[in-house]
Amino acid sequence: LSAGSINSPQLLQLSGVGPSGLLQSLGIDVVVDLPGVGENLQDHVMAGMSFSVKNDKDVPPQKVTGNKKTDSYVNSAVSYVAFHNIFNDADAFRGKIQARVKAIPDELNVDDSVREGYRAVYDKIANDLFYSNVSPVEILGNVMFGSISLQAALQHPLSRGNIRITSKNPFDYPRINPNYFREDIDLKILREAFKLIREITQQPPLKDHIASENWPGNGVQSNEQWEDWIRNAAGTEYHPSSTCAMLPRNKGGVVN
């Protein structure tokens, strides 16, 4: 059964496959008690900075600067930035991640099987991913008439949400809890990514074409100001996943 990361757990739960406590509370007969159905929701949370350009006339986006290489970047390029390029103290921050991921599973109100799956995945993230050249963030460029938008999207969040039905009616929307920024580490990674974006715009060739930073603006400088802005500006990149995890059932997955 595959209906996407939102509707797959919804249909399974409606069919009696999912966390028994949830199903029984809604009067649904339990066919298979599978606690991981609807858990482990992950998403690429993102936000974008906006800059006005010096040539703000009615110029098509593909010719905003007149330089093909520059225009190519700000219109269509996607950059994946390695962990050590985002954090000056990358080793120290990796240590914080390792310490944190050991504690997260025990803090979550989930079934023991789901907790074991979290432990396995978090261990992989902390010990492999953040020590490789795999990027924790994606940086995207986009040009509109008179402005440039540079966005950062978190690629490997530590925060986990869930999806749960609210009734037996298949036409009722499930409750989606993305749980963005439950883990402060996610917020800090995005914060440093946006600092990098600001730095990029202050270097050639972009600095020669940017007139001002419109959003969030130069008033945002401290770590606290960056984090407040991100909390208010961030949203989904529409990449939810993992609500029917391809893990063994004893680790909260749906694979027998």
Model-inferred region functions:
Residues L1-F51, D56, I148-P205, D228-N256:
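C-terminal structured subdomain/cap of oxidoreductase catalytic cores
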Residues P9-L12, G16-M144, P205, Q221-Q225, ...:
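Mid-to-C-terminal "cap/lid" subdomains and adjacent gly/pro-rich loops that border
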Residues F145, G219-Q221, N250-G252:
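Short, internal active-site loops enriched in acidic
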Residues I185, G217-E224:
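Short coil/turn linker and secondary-structure boundary residues
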Residues K207-G219:
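Short, glycine/acidic-rich hinge or "gate" loops at secondary-structure transitions
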Residues N214, Q225-D228:
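Residues in intrinsically disordered, low-complexity segments of regulatory proteins
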